[in-house]
Amino acid sequence: ADQAGIQKVVDGLAGQIDRGAVNADVIVDTGGEVIKTLTEGQTGRTLGDTSGIAAAFAAQLAQANGKFALTVAETPFETTKTERRIDVNLSTQTTTLYQNGQVYRTYTISSGAGDHATHTGNFRIGWKTEMQNMGCVPGYDYCTKDVPWVSYFNGDEGFHGTYWHNNFGTPMSHGCINMTIPQAKELYDWAYRGTEVSVHY
């Protein structure tokens, strides 16, 4: 076997094998369950001492054994967990985004009015869409076109942008949480499916 030729391959092994660890970045709920992985974690690898490998492999090849185990050290990755949840206070007409237990944003909103009061309870963000018509089908007594940045949390109740009024702080909707369009987009981008939503007075 060509030991010098093998040595050239050995000299390039570290460049192919060595890699730094990539830390994981995840969004979790208040129970610690992952609802969104932003970055997958990956262990790091470092090739061990390569001195003598070429000679040892050449000797093995002479015995018709072409399998050679390399010594590789692994470095574990770390995981950064960010907890997110949403609180809707119908008494104060506010929606607050919490990140790691701290207030991230607070918005003045308009919830459901009269017989269409927003339901209280504990929910999770489900289906999301950048724009849709609301109502506009039999069974609904209203039709609002091109409603932006919709994040549903309880059936047909959700957060969305509002262009047809600016009366935030007063219940105005058919059950949804009306927000300014920039605020609704910020919530849409921040709150992944599975994010907890608490609605209360």
Segments and roles (model prediction):
Residues 20-22, 88-93, 145-146, 191-193:
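A short, compositionally biased
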Residues 7, 117-122, 129-201:
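Exported/periplasmic cell-wall-interacting domains
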Residues 1-85, 92:
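Short glycine/threonine-rich beta-strand-turn micro-motifs
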Residues 76-113:
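A structural motif detector for short, solvent-exposed N-terminal "entry" segments of globular domains
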